[in-house]
Amino acid sequence: MKIKKEHMNSHLIGFGKIKCLFPKALRKSGYRVIQRLKERFFRIVAMASPKRSRRYCPCCDVKFRTFSTGQYKEKPDRFNTSRYLQTKQDVICPICGSLPRHRILASWCENHKTFFSSSSILYFAPENCMIRWLERNGISCTTSDPYYSADLKLDIQATGLPVASYDVIIANHVLEHVDDFRRALREVYRILKPNGCFICSFPMDPKIELLDEEEEPLSSEERIRRFGQNDHKRVFGMKADQFLTEAGFEVEPIKGEDYPKEILPVVGPADYDMNILFCCRKT
């Protein structure tokens, strides 16, 4: 399974400079060594002081004293930094880079492991942290990303795949990036097998009911102002699950409040990261 580590490692200082200095194969090997060393270090710390290790990442199965803080506020050319002022920022796993939404998903998957183990899975824009969970549990999947290294280069709006191709389709924070999210939902429904499950999440602004999206291409500055990020084409509202229902799915929310505090299932790092996922069944 190929993944785009850029998704989950943008918070690491100097990572871009390292990419320029070393060839890809060496970077990949070095990355794995560093990850193993970090994982071993945190496991030793957790064993030495179990009572102080109050945080847990189900993606990499490691406990910590605290999670790491992102650098979102330092990137005003990409993020609306004002949307990170009132929310908790120490929410990133220092090993795999997971955010609350990933740890919620991994916890949910843990409770449905039998289903996943026997399912064909298509993962759009796969995150390193969730791939770690799948691999650790012996679950294979097909990855897809039109821009980064992946098994397939598919457009979620028009995959070209046969009808009813997969049992499970995952797309975390993808729908806010595509030109036509309704078309993407129709396509996912088409390629999902009967009784299959589409798991998705997207930014949800608590001040919006349904949707705020661009009607024509906006500048990066305007996207940052309205949608929180320079490559977002919309932000969804708190009743956006309506769009999933309209696409034909039977929708069940996966809420962070239903999961242990040790995984830190909080709102954040942005105020529109409500960290509500949706399990959408094709009935």
Please give the residue ranges for each predicted region:
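S-adenosyl-L-methionine-dependent methyltransferase catalytic module, highlighting the catalytic core
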Residues: 45-55, 59, 179-188, 193, ...
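Activation segment
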Residues: 160-163, 178-182
